[in-house]
Amino acid sequence: MNIAKIVVGGIVAGIICFVGDGVVHGVLLQPIWLDIAGTLNLPPGDPAASFAYYALYDLAKGFASVALYAAIRPRFGPGPRTAVIAGLAIWALCIPIPLLGLLPTHFFGRKFALLWSIYGAFPVVIGAVAGAALYKEEARSPA
């Protein structure tokens, strides 16, 4: 594995996840989030603290996607198909599976969880493909 390329690809994937999640939650799902916050009488969050938290969270998703791509690349081969597989695996672990675990709390409904899961797949998969495109194995020296 080429750790330097995982870092570079992970940063790119993380930035794409961060921007994409901003669109997902700040535009597409914002009316529902505002309704949930209003129903629970939650005060507005601190934008600076939220920015740092979500930036780190999305970088972690980006690094995980590219690291998984690098790990499965020998079995599945290099290229976008393998990157999509890696992105979908990280998406499943980060979004729909945790949301399924939260459904019994009734904090939000099934429709919202479904929308979040569908919309949330795009930034993770696109980020994984972009980050994986930057990944190359280290050249092996002749023995």
Residue spans for each PLM region:
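Juxtamembrane/disordered regions of integral membrane proteins
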Residues: 1-143
